[in-house]
Amino acid sequence: MALTGTDRVKRGMAEMQKGGVIMDVVNAEQAKIAEAAGAVAVMALERVPADIRAAGGVARMADPTVVEEVMNAVSIPVMAKVRIGHYVEARVLEALGVDYIDESEVLTPADEEFHIDKRQFTVPFVCGCRDLGEAARRIAEGASMLRTKGEPGTGNIVEAVRHMRKVNAQIRKVVSMSEDELVAEAKQLGAPVEVLREIKRIGRLPVVNFAAGGVATPADAALMMHLGADGVFVGSGIFKSENPEKYARAIVEATTHYEDYELIAHLSKGLGGAMRGIDVATLLPEHRMQERGW
């Protein structure tokens, strides 16, 4: 029988990344740039979300060779993505020794009914959420870390803002509820009532919630921290920009010093062009990655 990590241990590992930036990388060179810029972790994958979106087809777990190349290049934690519901991909990454697994809507879902039972794994998982119902379901499945889904690969922050605001508004609502209201809310959200009771008791999510999906500039990162994010994932925004090294350093600094507007102004000067981006409103429903998962 596989060994499993306790919630306390796995959540504690995720807490260690709080306040930091996690960057998508596709090779050792990019991983070294991310580490030098101050990233707290990297996400190893074959293609950044913008390229996955452009290529179409079926997006799967990265070749283990790519993941190992990144793991061997840096000393910071390494994450990797698996398809929603694909627990064998997750077992493969666990066997490789990755530090975290992202059950990600960026990849093509493998199961349209079940997410992975993350409690059966030693390695901690991160999952996306758009609202408190999704957040609570992922926590009940054993997620140790959450992130907004946003709309990956667009360079457009609007959906990440929407998701962060919604989750936090729903938390405030739950905290003020009586027990009978809480039970009714759990039914409405499709969320386990035990998770909502824990949220009410502690006044927040029991796991960290990072911003992800559309962060492209230092100001974007600072905005998400202002809205209550515990940290920031940057997917396509860095290595699709004109100057990845500068963007990486600037986004890390802006995330740390998100209330220092003079510094953010300084960091934003002379960066070169940000990734071109996509207006989310122009995407057809079937092209919205955030709709994946349930």
UniProtKB/Swiss-Prot annotation:
Report any one BP term from Gene Ontology: pyridoxine biosynthetic process
Keywords from UniProt, A to Z, are: Lyase, Pyridoxal phosphate, Schiff base
EC number of this enzyme: 4.3.3.6
Pfam family for this entry, one: SOR_SNZ
**Keyword Lyase part of the UniProt annotation:** yes
Per UniProt, subunit arrangement is: In the presence of PdxT, forms a dodecamer of heterodimers.
PANTHER family referenced in this protein's UniProt entry, alphabetically: PYRIDOXAL 5'-PHOSPHATE SYNTHASE SUBUNIT SNZ1-RELATED (PTHR31829:SF0)
Q: Which family does it belong to?
A: Belongs to the PdxS/SNZ family.
What's this protein's name? Pyridoxal 5'-phosphate synthase subunit PdxS
Q: Which gene encodes it?
A: pdxS
